[in-house]
């Protein structure tokens, strides 16, 4: 059940993924909200990220690069064509204009589509 929250591997960021409606159904639009916070759990200002969604066969169905969450949050409207479990990857690429560098600050969520 949403929201889901993960900490990146280095622990520099917390990423939350929320969605409405809470039950995702194929063919209907779902609003996903990405929240990025720093290690103290304050909103990360000017956070850039990539949002990648893959189906159960690891085929990329959505690939949104360089998304800007100016106040640490941003929403995306997405419609899934088929039911199944999708993997939502969120890769933080920069915060306050400072690149995250060689380290991949990424989280993954498993999300069911009915």
Regions found by a protein language model. Name each.
Residues 1-114:
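N-terminal soluble domains immediately following signal/targeting peptides that reside
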């Amino acid at each position: 059940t949403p929201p889901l929250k993960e900490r990146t591997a280095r622990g520099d960021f917390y990423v939350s993924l929320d969605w409405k409606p809470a039950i995702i159904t194929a063919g209907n639009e779902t609003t996903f909200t990405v929240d990025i916070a720093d290690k103290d759990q304050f909103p990360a200002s000017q956070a850039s990220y990539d949002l990648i969604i893959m189906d159960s066969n690891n085929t990329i169905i959505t690939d949104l690069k360089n998304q800007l969450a100016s106040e640490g949050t941003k929403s995306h409207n997405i419609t899934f064509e088929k039911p199944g479990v999708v993997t939502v990857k969120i890769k933080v690429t920069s915060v306050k204009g400072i690149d995250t560098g060689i380290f991949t600050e990424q989280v993954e969520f498993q999300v069911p589509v009915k």
